[in-house]
Amino acid sequence: MNINATLIGQTVAFIIFVWFCMKYVWPPLMNAIEERQKRIADGLANADRAAKDLELAQAKATEQLKEAKATANEIIESANKRKAQIVEEAKAEADAERARIIAQGKAEIEAERNRVKEELRKQVATLALAGAEKILERSIDAAAHSDIVEKLVAEI
């Protein structure tokens, strides 16, 4: 292998080409590669951050759902207590009304009973007087007297 001027010229041209590439072509390529690596790293970091944010959002949503269910249960329990209270109040009012109506009915019955007794006394007195008149008008005969008394008893 002979070293001649062509080989030296090619070597010098290759060295100049390598130096040119290292000076002007390689830095933009490295910058492009570094930017790409940085974008990929940022994208992965954003994906990790988004995944963590998603987990936090899901945890928060789950917590809010639990709180909403607890609040709903409290509202339902409070409504049930109020319902029971209203039912008890209605029962108490109904019992009081029933007692009042019964007392009023008993009072009316007692008043009617007293009125009937008084009326009966008046009728008995009238019948007794009428019987006494009849006895006095007739002769005091035992048979007639017992007949009148039987009629009076039948009328009473």
Swiss-Prot record:
SUPFAM superfamilies: F1F0 ATP synthase subunit B, membrane domain (SSF81573). It comes from the Bacteria. Pfam families: ATP-synt_B. Keywords: ATP synthesis, Cell inner membrane, Cell membrane, CF(0), Hydrogen ion transport, Ion transport, Membrane, Transmembrane, Transmembrane helix, Transport. The chain crosses the membrane at residues 7-29. GO terms for molecular function: proton-transporting ATP synthase activity, rotational mechanism; proton-transporting ATPase activity, rotational mechanism. It is found in: Cell inner membrane. F(1)F(0) ATP synthase produces ATP from ADP in the presence of a proton or sodium gradient. F-type ATPases consist of two structural domains, F(1) containing the extramembraneous catalytic core and F(0) containing the membrane proton channel, linked together by a central stalk and a peripheral stalk. During catalysis, ATP synthesis in the catalytic domain of F(1) is coupled via a rotary mechanism of the central stalk subunits to proton translocation. Component of the F(0) channel, it forms part of the peripheral stalk, linking F(1) to F(0). This is ATP synthase subunit b.
